[in-house]
């Protein structure tokens, strides 16, 4: 070895120094660095798991939100349909009430017209009876007796009823 220019004691001392340096570096640097790298890897994996959990929770929250929105829309549509149905029922009730009121007013008008017709007919009969009596009195020149007067009125009214 000396022929190569290598001093064997120096070589052994340097080899021992190198091995000692490797042992010291391994004990002082390699293990802490490896522990640091392992810890970092563990934290990264944990962060990835946490991110995946958050993503799943977000997806679940989104599904819940969409389901709630769909439920709210259905509820709103149901409320609108119920309101429309109630409006139709109220409309039908109002129309029926208006028809009943119109029919009642029509019947009242018809009854009043019938009463007015009867009253006018009664007045007309009375006036005609008076006119017949007056005319008969003038034509005959004398006042009819009460009995004859009543018979003449009845006959005139019967003739008038036959015309109507």
Swiss-Prot record:
Listed under subunit, the entry gives: F-type ATPases have 2 components, F(1) - the catalytic core - and F(0) - the membrane proton channel. F(1) has five subunits: alpha(3), beta(3), gamma(1), delta(1), epsilon(1). F(0) has four main subunits: a(1), b(2) and c(10-14). The alpha and beta chains form an alternating ring which encloses part of the gamma chain. F(1) is attached to F(0) by a central stalk formed by the gamma and epsilon chains, while a peripheral stalk is formed by the delta and b chains.
**Which GO molecular function terms does the record list?**
proton-transporting ATP synthase activity, rotational mechanism
What is this protein identified as? Answer: ATP synthase subunit b
Provide the membrane topology annotation: Single-pass membrane protein
Species of the source? Chloroflexus aurantiacus (strain ATCC 29366 / DSM 635 / J-10-fl)
Transmembrane intervals: 4-24
Keywords carried by this UniProt record: ATP synthesis, Cell membrane, CF(0), Hydrogen ion transport, Ion transport, Membrane, Transmembrane, Transmembrane helix, Transport
Q: Report the protein's function.
A: F(1)F(0) ATP synthase produces ATP from ADP in the presence of a proton or sodium gradient. F-type ATPases consist of two structural domains, F(1) containing the extramembraneous catalytic core and F(0) containing the membrane proton channel, linked together by a central stalk and a peripheral stalk. During catalysis, ATP synthesis in the catalytic domain of F(1) is coupled via a rotary mechanism of the central stalk subunits to proton translocation. Component of the F(0) channel, it forms part of the peripheral stalk, linking F(1) to F(0).
Gene of this entry: atpF
Q: What is a single cellular component term in the Gene Ontology annotation?
A: plasma membrane
């Amino acid at each position: 070895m000396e022929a190569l220019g290598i001093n064997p004691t120096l070589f052994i001392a340097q080899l021992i120094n190198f091995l000692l340096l490797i042992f010291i570096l391994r004990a002082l640097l390699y293990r802490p660095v490896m522990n640091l790298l392992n810890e970092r890897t563990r934290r990264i994996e944990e962060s990835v798991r946490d991110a995946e959990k958050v993503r799943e929770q977000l997806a679940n929250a989104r599904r819940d939100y969409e389901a709630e929105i769909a439920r709210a829309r259905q509820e709103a549509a149901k409320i609108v349909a119920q309101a429309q149905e109630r409006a139709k029922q109220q409309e039908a009730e109002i129309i029926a009430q208006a028809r009943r009121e119109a029919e009642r007013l029509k019947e009242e008008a018809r009854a009043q017209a019938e009463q007015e017709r009867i009253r006018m007919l009664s007045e007309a009969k009375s006036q005609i009876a008076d006119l017949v009596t007056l005319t008969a009195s003038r034509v005959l020149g004398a006042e009819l007796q009460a009995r004859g007067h009543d018979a003449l009125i009845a006959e005139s009214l019967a003739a008038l009823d036959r015309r109507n």
